[in-house]
From Swiss-Prot:
GO terms for biological process: capsule polysaccharide biosynthetic process; cell wall macromolecule biosynthetic process; cell wall organization. It is found in: Cell membrane; Secreted, Cell wall. Its EC number is 2.4.1.287. This is Galactofuranosyltransferase GlfT1.
Amino acid sequence: MTHTEVVCAVVVTHRRRELLATSLDAVVSQDRKPDHLIVVDNDNDPQVRELVTGQPVPSTYLGSRRNLGGAGGFALGMLHALALGADWIWLADDDGRPADTTVLSTLLSCAHTHSLAEVSPMVCNLDDPQRLAFPLRRGLVWRRLTSELRTDSSSSSGDLLPGIASLFNGALFRADTVDAVGVPDLRLFVRGDEVELHRRLVRSGLPFGTCLTASYLHPCGTDEFKPILGGRMHTQYPDDETKRFFTYRNRGYLLSQPGLRKLLPQEWLRFGWYFLVSRRDLAGLREWIRLRRLGRRERFQR
């Protein structure tokens, strides 16, 4: 008897009920519907529970009385999916959505064709889908357009960008892959949790990549990335102080880990240039150093 693969969709939300409704509608409207929907609500909102239980696919609502952040929310949802017997785990958040009804089936087909442990769609700007929602660095070159990713493809079919993926936004994991690389690190809360899991995925040696024929729509996140050196490099500077705290502290931890330490010289160059030359902000550089030191020492108190 042929085993029918079970796909569990995991969506994490926090106080975005209307956006969540739009996201869930796109998730459950796929031509290959997920077999089970799991929604982790970091606000434990009864209205969100009602929304989830009213979906047209079997659904589980996990309301948390403590905000677990994106990292903890996805960790909880992924573990619950494994406990339900999922063969594949499809991740989404509340402010993004699959671009069309074929995304899940396309990802599954790509994963089977290329024997992938994980596959992600391109994450595109919600308002301009020809542009990426987040710039993607390839060596020292930043890619901002979907067409630029397609020119990087090394697969014979032209549908796969191997060895790099945007995690959580439409990412599809084999269950066995989660056994090998684990779930997101709760301590990171928000910011950098996807980079850390990507680091583990790379070090595992498992095959993964970005499917260039599937897209996931997400609000533009490029505003945080400030160009330096005439646009040849970029530095991340969130306008919100809280986001800067988590971004810089967590990067301090990330760049102390195996597989990412090689980026340290470039990190110091980029941020040193940005704070001292672009902003002329010595106090900002000192705060960046303080926050990254907290992360390097694994001081994750909020």
